Regions:
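Short, solvent-exposed amphipathic alpha-helical segments in soluble enzyme
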Residues: 88, 282-286, 478-482
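Short, conserved phosphate/pyrophosphate- and ester-handling motifs at nucleotide-, phospho-/glycolipid
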Residues: 22, 76, 271, 455
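C-terminal accessory regions
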Residues: 351-353, 357-360, 365-504
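ASCE P-loop NTPase helicase motor core
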Residues: 26-27, 31, 36-231
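Conserved SAM-binding loop
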Residues: 18, 72, 267
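Conserved pre-motif I regulatory segment
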Residues: 2-40
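Catalytic phosphate/metal-binding cores of nucleic-acid and nucleotide-processing enzymes, i.e., regions
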Residues: 39, 77, 336-339, 362, ...
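Conserved helicase motor core of P-loop NTPases
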Residues: 3-6, 29-30, 37, 154-160, ...
């Protein structure tokens, strides 16, 4: 298919005339797709409200219609869910597609870079601003540098190429000053031929949105290097952005939970300490929760966990073997193969994944810590259900997860139970397989930090920036504020917003 044919087919999928910037981006995309260079890559940078989502959706629908193979990826489960809803086809986490488990070693699994068996495939990665390359998470996954591994994976395939989609005004990955996956210079360093385009103009249908009007103003402070005073927010004339006095917050949150649900409402704040305060207040005063943890509570995983998914895979395999022994017919074997696929479990539970408590079945105090056995449902993984042991101590701690000292304390207490195993190597192996040592570390998910919310979208978003003065103004704060604002799709509430930051 030539350039003009591909461009015409994508335009047909738009449903409305593209903006000049969208048309230019489309020109770049069709050139990228028809380039014979096997090492071509494209970056599509677009800010909130500029039509990036509608453009990528039209591209996906067109490529599927012309039978061009496409794989949709995103850095987190929530981001993959949003990408899937916006494009109309399944999307997966990057980790789930590019890594395979080498060996389960208890707390820290070991995942190697997978072989890329895809051919003639376009890998489209949304929310690429979140892709890190510093290796802060150690080497549990491949080289420890996600961007390195993603590029290596894609370009080891035959005639595969990569389209990175993201917003450079959002928070960059932790420890990095900018998002490496959205940098043309960074990608050229891999020997890739880079196509790039930017969408900056807010499309007409977005101009009536107070969320996008103010987010655009904040973004322009970044692009124009005009970070000299705290931004003033315009509320008047808009119905989708509101000041939220603290005295009205409890009632407003209750209304949001009633209107759009617990899973589509979020409070975004600046620290784990503030998130804890909000979570306790919401549970006690809005949801009337009296127990430490109850059915219906929303939780967030705060440390990667590999053990429980490995246990799930073992259970599924055992069930299938048991059924196969009962019935050996060809008809059943076909059914069994279908069951294997339909029960595909996530490779691991990632820091930031959200879960709903369906049942609290057992509580126990052991080793100086508090545990519970829960039935959990994961809304970002097709409502996958899992029974697991959860560590309750992290629910209200100010630290992001168990501290190093607490982890050491838990390890040594559990080790005492395995003193009958003489060889240290065997003893370590047994501890790493212990369900309490591998208990899920969780926090309540009604209020989260902005890094935890990044990649997701919620109908109702409440933003708490805490106390701010001009002296505390940094580029990081402006990126934080922009990222927090753009999590909202319907209503944005600014909690206890100071008069000095309101446009008069």
């Amino acid at each position: 298919m030539n350039i003009e044919e591909l461009k015409y087919k994508i335009l047909q999928q738009f449903g409305f005339p593209p903006t000049p910037e969208q048309a230019q981006a489309l020109d770049v995309f069709v050139q990228f797709m028809t380039d014979s260079n096997p090492h071509a890559v494209m970056i599509l940078r677009g800010s909130a409200g500029t039509g990036k989502t509608s453009l990528s959706g039209a591209i996906v629908r067109t490529l599927r219609a012309v039978r061009q193979k496409v794989m949709l990826l995103a850095p987190t489960g929530r981001a993959a869910k949003v990408f899937s809803l916006n494009s109309g086809m399944p999307a997966y986490t990057i980790h789930r597609r590019i890594y395979r488990e080498k060996a389960f070693a208890g707390v820290d699994g070991q995942f190697n870079l997978n072989d890329n068996l895809y051919t003639d495939t376009l890998f489209m990665v949304d929310e690429a601003s979140m892709i890190a390359n510093l290796g802060l998470g150690g080497t549990t996954f491949g080289s420890g540098c996600l961007l390195d591994d993603l590029i290596h994976f894609v370009y080891q395939g035959r005639n595969d190429r990569l389209l990175l989609i993201g917003d450079k005004a959002q928070l960059p990955p932790v420890g990095e000053e900018e998002s490496p996956a959205l940098s043309a210079a960074m990608l050229q360093g891999y020997g890739l031929s880079v196509y790039e385009c930017d969408l900056n103009e807010v499309v007409r249908q977005s101009q009536q949105s107070g969320i996008l009007f103010n987010a655009t103003r904040i973004r322009q402070m970044i692009t124009h290097d005009d970070i000299t005073q705290l931004p003033k927010i315009r509320f008047s004339g808009f119905s989708d952005i509101r000041e939220m006095p603290g005295a009205e917050l409890i009632e407003a949150l209750g209304d949001s939970y009633h209107q759009v649900g617990l899973d589509d409402t979020i409070v975004v704040t600046r620290s784990n300490k503030r998130a804890n305060i909000f979570n306790q207040g919401i549970r006690n005063m809005v949801l009337d929760r009296e127990e430490e943890l109850e059915s219906g509570d929303m939780l967030m995983i705060v440390k990667n966990n590999y053990y429980w998914m490995e246990e799930e895979r073992k259970k599924i395999k055992e069930r299938q073997l048991s059924e196969e022994r009962k019935v050996k017919s060809e008809k059943f074997n076909t059914l069994a193969n279908h069951i294997v696929q339909s029960n595909e479990v996530p490779a691991f539970l990632a820091n930031g994944d959200r879960a709903k408590v369906m049942k609290v079945s057992r509580r126990i105090d052991l080793y100086g810590f508090h545990f519970a056995t829960l039935l959990l449902k994961f809304p970002d993984y097709d409502n996958y259900e899992l029974e697991a042991t959860v560590l309750l101590d992290t629910l209200t701690s100010e630290a992001p997860a168990l501290t190093h000292d607490q982890q050491e304390q838990l390890f040594h207490k559990i080790e005492e139970d395995y003193q009958d195993i003489p060889l240290k190597a065997d003893r370590m192996k047994a501890i790493r397989q212990d369900p309490y040592f591998n208990a899920l570390q969780v926090k309540f998910a009604y209020a989260v930090t902005c890094h935890k919310a990044q990649g997701g979208q919620w109908s109702h978003v409440y933003v708490d920036q805490g106390y701010m003065t001009d002296d505390m103004l940094t580029p990081d704060y402006i990126h934080w504020l922009y990222t927090a604002f753009t999590r909202a799709t319907e209503m944005l509430y600014l909690v206890n917003w100071p008069n000095t930051q309101i446009e008069g």
